[in-house]
Amino acid sequence: KVDSAKKTLTALNPDVDVVTYDVRLGADNIMDILAGYDVVIDGADNFPSRYLLNDASVKLGIPVVHGSIFRFEGQVTVFDPRGGVTYRDMLPEPPPAEFAPSCAEAGVLGVLPGIVGSIQALEAIKLILGLGEGLSGRLVAFDAMDMSFREYRLQKDPSLEVTWENRDRIEIAELDG
């Protein structure tokens, strides 16, 4: 995946410096990989990676443009750890495995990654350039079956321990799964 992505991105724009990490993202390397970046675009396809990314981004204070897909639906939001909502605010604990089949098990409409990825790219550009109203605190859900978009307000969970204010106490660890 890494080499293919780099080749494609370089072909689209040879002036872009594409940095790849051909490693499994884990508690042992995520802080080093994310350090120095201004925005993270999350396309993780599993809950352990999403929680790992959340905790590291909160500790580092890096906003995350989150995108997820399932069957005929996609979701996009921006998690802003420096005062905004985070992934753990939206979903404090991973759902039981029987309620969260993988994309391979459940199936995904082939065009959804492109739709969700385009919205994520737009949100990342807005964040970097400081333009428009971003999706921090709001989740946009796309339903391909009826071609509708819905918006949901997200709220901070005041009982959470994994917060920007507690960043020095955050232990980066991997969830089983």
Predicted regions located by residue number:
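Adenine nucleotide-associated cytosolic modules
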Residues: 1-177
